[in-house]
Amino acid sequence: MLRDANEGMSTIPGFSQIQFEGFCRFIDRGLMEELNKFPKIEDTDQEIEFQLFVETYQLVEPLIKERDAVHESLTYCSELYVPAGLIWKTGKDIQEQTIFIGNIPLMNSLGTSIVNGIYRIVINQILQSPGIYYRSELDHNGISVYTGTIISDWGGRSELEIDRKARIWARVSRKQKISILVPSSAMGSNLKEIIDNVCYPEIFLSFPNDKEKKKIGSKENAILEFYQQFACVGGDPVFSESLCKELQKKFFQQRCELGRIGRRNMNRRLNLDIPHNITFLLPRDVLAAADHLIGMKFGMGTLDDMNHLKNKRIRSVADLLQDQFGLAMVRLENAVRGTIGGAIRQKLIPTPHNLVTSTPLTTTYESFFGLHPLSQVLDRTNPLTQIVHGRKSSYLGPGGLTGRTASFRIRDIHPSHYGRICPIDTSEGINVGLIGSLAIHARIGHWGSLERPFYEISERSKGVRVIYLSPSIDEYYMVTAGNSLALNHGIQEEQVVPARYRQEFLTIAWEQIQLRSIFPFQYFSVGASLIPFIEHNDANRALMSSNMQRQAVPLSRSEKCIVGTGLERQAALDSGVSAIAEHEGKIIYTDTDKIILSGNGATLSIPLVMYQRSNKNTCMHQKPQVSRGKCIKKGQILADGAATVGGELALGKNVLVAYMPWEGYNFEDAVLISERLVYGDIYTSFHIRKYEIQTHVTSQGPERITNEIPHLEAHLLRNLDRNGIVMLGSWVETGDILVGKLTPQVAKESSYAPEDRLLRAILGIQVSTAKETCLKLPIGGRGRVIDVRWIHKKGGSSYNPETIRVYISQKREIKVGDKVAGRHGNKGIISKILPRQDMPYLQDGTPVDMVFNPLGVPSRMNVGQIFECSLGLAGGLLDRHYRIAPFDERYEQEASRKLVFSELYEASKQTANPWVFEPEYPGKSRIFDGRTGDPFAQPVIIGKSYILKLIHQVDDKIHGRSSGHYALVTQQPLRGRAKQGGQRVGEMEVWALEGFGVAHILQEMLTYKSDHIRARQEVLGTTIIGGTIPNPEDAPESFRLLVRELRSLALELNHFLVSEKNFQINRKEA
């Protein structure tokens, strides 16, 4: 019951621990379990037997390092070797060899895998646990219908149903249902055994008539009847071995395989004692399930809550990798059988090496990591993103739900989620509630359940004991939250505390409490735990904040937050972006590239990450924090990574903000900023883009990398070296050549005019035999070349082309259109950058850095930003940093407000600035207009908030089109920035233009600028010669397309011209 117990206080577990434990479970147990299932394989004459000796398998240390695997687009994996034997039964000879089975991708220190040079992570899936579940539904007459649903390990479902006459049916499909006696008899039980093994035999005897008794008279008859109903087959099928195999494959294997978890759940729910190694559904299970269903009908027993976490199981990385390994072993078995058969037919002598190929295992894992929905590319925007991605839990994926079919009840927060799944952190949109994040202290138990820790309160033991309980156990205990009495239960004045028992909230005496919470953060995910004063925010805004922190861009000069929660250091440590000393010693050398550490009689060189690109184009970089000659201890920070300072997470900047309107520039969440943030490089970030090109061997010959490209201006080729590749350190602009490449082509003489051929013959000009296919810098890619990699794949065949990658760094200051956000869901777009002399300024002359709209606070109910803003001002003046746990009101009422006001008062005293805390309007101050010097009419809240710059930047989004490609069918401009597309003037936009009566603009939008082919071709020529653009005479292409589509439906559409004089109809084709 109590999974784990240890004395003393609890520590926060590693944020990547769930991934590590899952992979270790796969290596320790899952690998051996699947290898043990590999059967002995014999040939058709049973003369040769092949088997694996799995007890001594070996996993070899990887041949390459992680960093090399990323740069060379390889997989960081270990080779699996297993001893195998080939036994000749006639001569009793055995041939034993150690064979290479395949490659298994390994998990690195970040909890991720590197497959084909890409960091990938496997997220946890939440599935319905196999077993039986009872529920009740009302039929069309308002009468309760009780059903029992048996869920198999494969996810297949079978239902038992009891009707008004107390007859029990087994539903094999939506439309077909048969008597419970038929499947029981088909599984091997006769009527006497059924009657002897049920609690209500009279009910089972009441409903079979003579015809039904004949159907279950023998096992063969029952199987035939069951097969007819299940497969909806008419006539009189004949019992045969193939019919049994088909029924076994289509029904019993998919719907009756319970697995070890399903067997445990079935035994618990039905009070059975069937051994755990019998994982198949037995007749005894079906009869016990029917008995419980009858009891439900008579008001005995309890119904199941399908959304309770005790009825769910976590499919972790261990289960997914083990499933894939089992699938690969099945494929290997089939391949070995085929190879043995082929060798015998051709009269060859096989060896274990010849029989086994590594392809099944290697390709299975490559396709799993590349194609499986639960294997995702690791989001590496910032260090927090990496941690949170590995702690996701999803209801989606194979065997799970879909975003369009999941009900509101499944998406909703359940009381059993408390302390296991964060009630705040989930995705927005169609997957809301389906993709969540595990709470900080949650862990995955042996049976796939989510466990959470408690402090056990016992009168016998005076020490504090931490225990982990699964959701099926903790609801039977009296559990109290970590309030003031729980933290200090020596106080006798408070005798009554709130508690939870069986998903109900009670108020009971302290003596009756059995368990209590261990940590204020234990209910939240990592992202939500980094929000200070989260208890003062609306949950929807806290959700937005935890999502937006994952979108923060690492800045060039990071800064620790003044107001935090205390988890920043743990988050930075577990992200792996900082360099940590593995043992104590002395620094003997340090530079930007490496740190050399001497200690324990050895010298260790620690390479540092230098301007490495993440998959979101952000810059990952390490900065040394130790100097030469310094003695360090084990675990000390040697170098800070991206978005970390002093080993703490630092995603944003502490800037001086004011909540006030300013000339309408902060209307609708827009943000007004000072030019200090631009020129002081406060919000400057580096972004690294990757451009690559491959060289192939074509039918005309190999492609060439060269700097001699004909017909191109020398200006575009100025940055190429003698090999035709751009030089390191070059500044490149849009359109510049990064890699010069020529592709061979055959020139046809017939394609040239006679005059061309004559001139070439006279002047001796050679025909060009190659076309230019250079790598050019696209729009918006200007920057500095920081790295070039020329990757030669082994083998050098046409199937392994050479790849050249060019990395370009961009320095981006904050500008109008960029998105910024606080840690309380307060987000906005930069609307204007003011000179610092025009910004509002404080009474000591300090200009404000940002101006937010005060109307963004009351309706959004995220008041935590006001507490952070005021406390940040006090911390900035006193040079203090605050780390505040949530729910501090458990100590006393208004604790947050008292803390903020006391710190403001102290800052006012120590700095001799009475305007910092004015009793008439505490937290507010009178500030002045920078343009006029006059004070504003009302006092304004000013303070220091921690503001993040998000990855949604205007440089990646702004787009314009003068000309470009058109869609083939509609002849309208393509959609999207990547295709150089245009904006579509849709139906509602046309209505808006009609409302203003702008007929000529509307005509241009619908013809010249869109899909009138002839008219848009005439525009360019007439514009050049200065002529008048002719009006389009016929209909645009989209209208003609509509006419054609109507014709395909046998509807002819024509229009007619009516004469004004004689009203004669002149027909004209559309």
From Swiss-Prot:
GO CC, sorted alphabetically, is: chloroplast; DNA-directed RNA polymerase complex; mitochondrion
What the entry lists under Gene3D superfamilies is as follows: 2.40.50.100, 2.40.50.150, 3.90.1100.10, DNA-directed RNA polymerase, beta subunit, external 1 domain (2.30.150.10), DNA-directed RNA polymerase, subunit 2, domain 6 (2.40.270.10), RNA polymerase alpha subunit dimerisation domain (3.90.1800.10), RNA polymerase Rpb2, domain 2 (3.90.1110.10)
Q: Which reaction does it catalyse?
A: RNA(n) + a ribonucleoside 5'-triphosphate = RNA(n+1) + diphosphate
Name the UniProt key words of this record, in alphabetical order: Chloroplast, DNA-directed RNA polymerase, Nucleotidyltransferase, Plastid, Transcription, Transferase
- What is the superkingdom listed in this entry's lineage? Eukaryota
Q: What is the lineage of its organism?
A: Eukaryota, Viridiplantae, Streptophyta, Embryophyta, Tracheophyta
Q: What InterPro entries has UniProt attached to this entry?
A: DNA-dir_RNA_pol_bsu_ext_1_sf (IPR042107), DNA-dir_RNA_pol_su2 (IPR015712), DNA-dir_RNAP_su2_dom (IPR007120), DNA-dir_RNAP_su2_hyb_sf (IPR037033), RNA_pol_bsu_bac (IPR010243), RNA_pol_bsu_CS (IPR007121), RNA_pol_Rpb2_2 (IPR007642), RNA_pol_Rpb2_2_sf (IPR037034)
Asked if Protein biosynthesis is a keyword of the record, the answer is no
Which cysteines are disulphide-bonded?
Answer: none
Q: Which gene encodes it?
A: rpoB
The entry assigns this protein to a family as follows: Belongs to the RNA polymerase beta chain family.
Q: Name where it's found.
A: Plastid, Chloroplast
Listed GO molecular functions?
DNA binding; DNA-directed RNA polymerase activity; ribonucleoside binding
Complex formation: In plastids the minimal PEP RNA polymerase catalytic core is composed of four subunits: alpha, beta, beta', and beta''. When a (nuclear-encoded) sigma factor is associated with the core the holoenzyme is formed, which can initiate transcription.
Q: Which GO terms describe its biological process?
A: DNA-templated transcription
Protein name per Swiss-Prot or TrEMBL: DNA-directed RNA polymerase subunit beta
**EC number(s) stated in the UniProt entry for this protein:** 2.7.7.6
- Function noted in UniProt: DNA-dependent RNA polymerase catalyzes the transcription of DNA into RNA using the four ribonucleoside triphosphates as substrates.
